[in-house]
């Protein structure tokens, strides 16, 4: 595809949606083609830029994809698992690419994403920050060097409104570490501890979750030995880091064939 990539943002009035609208406005090679809200929203008809606090864009919010089907090439979706699957099905029918930043999918829902990706290009990533994706590469190296003789813990914190726990990013951290060590995360993950738990099993990977205030996103992996520990941490101070990553993914995805891709591929880290 040549020229600008036309992007649609769904869930435009949410915290992430507003950041995505701002990122669209700031990125060369990206043009905002549509901004979509839930059906019946009182914001329908309002200028998307004025709603997001970035100035008049001359683009009114709508409440269904069919109304703007000819206005965009790539849909960006950070909504909910159920909503995202419905939007993905629509994109597959229409031949539209989709960038998915939604988290909280169960196993069956992930299988549906895989199936739809046979029909249309999909980037799906629990975190689109460049720093987080680099962190996953560092975790793979740390696990290979230290994982067999250290206790591994993952601690994550987000704002009080986040609905799923642990975060998709934390789970991906666990998957990267477990895969590097030849372990099955479903068998070795320990989610929180309470009461008399007994001595720690060296094979386990622990998860701890914080939900407080307006934390944007903080993730730490700890490799703890007797006498020393290594901590690898990423802290996001603004949702714009995720929104900017989504713009990068959208531009890359517009050139791809149908298939399921991740941010490692977008960034050339594979």
UniProtKB/Swiss-Prot annotation:
GO molecular function terms listed in the Swiss-Prot or TrEMBL record: 4-hydroxy-tetrahydrodipicolinate reductase; NAD binding; NADP binding; oxidoreductase activity, acting on CH or CH2 groups, NAD or NADP as acceptor
Keyword Oxidoreductase appears in the UniProt entry: yes
Pfam family, one: DapB_N
GO biological process: diaminopimelate biosynthetic process; lysine biosynthetic process via diaminopimelate
Tagged with keyword Glycoprotein: no
Domain of life, source organism: Bacteria
Binding site for (S)-2,3,4,5-tetrahydrodipicolinate: 159, 168-169
Subcellular location: Cytoplasm
InterPro entries attached to this UniProt entry: DapB_C, DapB_N, DapB_N_CS, DHDPR_bac, NAD(P)-bd_dom_sf
Pathway(s) per entry: Amino-acid biosynthesis; L-lysine biosynthesis via DAP pathway; (S)-tetrahydrodipicolinate from L-aspartate: step 4/4
Binding site for NADP(+): 38
UniProt-annotated catalytic positions: 158 (proton donor/acceptor), 162 (proton donor)
Record field: catalytic activity: (S)-2,3,4,5-tetrahydrodipicolinate + NAD(+) + H2O = (2S,4S)-4-hydroxy-2,3,4,5-tetrahydrodipicolinate + NADH + H(+); (S)-2,3,4,5-tetrahydrodipicolinate + NADP(+) + H2O = (2S,4S)-4-hydroxy-2,3,4,5-tetrahydrodipicolinate + NADPH + H(+)
Keyword list, A-Z: Amino-acid biosynthesis, Cytoplasm, Diaminopimelate biosynthesis, Lysine biosynthesis, NAD, NADP, Oxidoreductase
Gene Ontology cellular component terms for the protein in this record: cytosol
Positions bound to NAD(+): 11-16, 37, 101-103, 125-128
EC numbers on record: 1.17.1.8
NCBIfam families: dapB
Function recorded in the entry: Catalyzes the conversion of 4-hydroxy-tetrahydrodipicolinate (HTPA) to tetrahydrodipicolinate.
PANTHER family: 4-HYDROXY-TETRAHYDRODIPICOLINATE REDUCTASE 1, CHLOROPLASTIC-RELATED (PTHR20836:SF0), DIHYDRODIPICOLINATE REDUCTASE (PTHR20836)
Family: Belongs to the DapB family.
Designated name of the protein: 4-hydroxy-tetrahydrodipicolinate reductase
Organism encoding this protein: Shewanella amazonensis (strain ATCC BAA-1098 / SB2B)
Gene transcribed to yield this protein: dapB
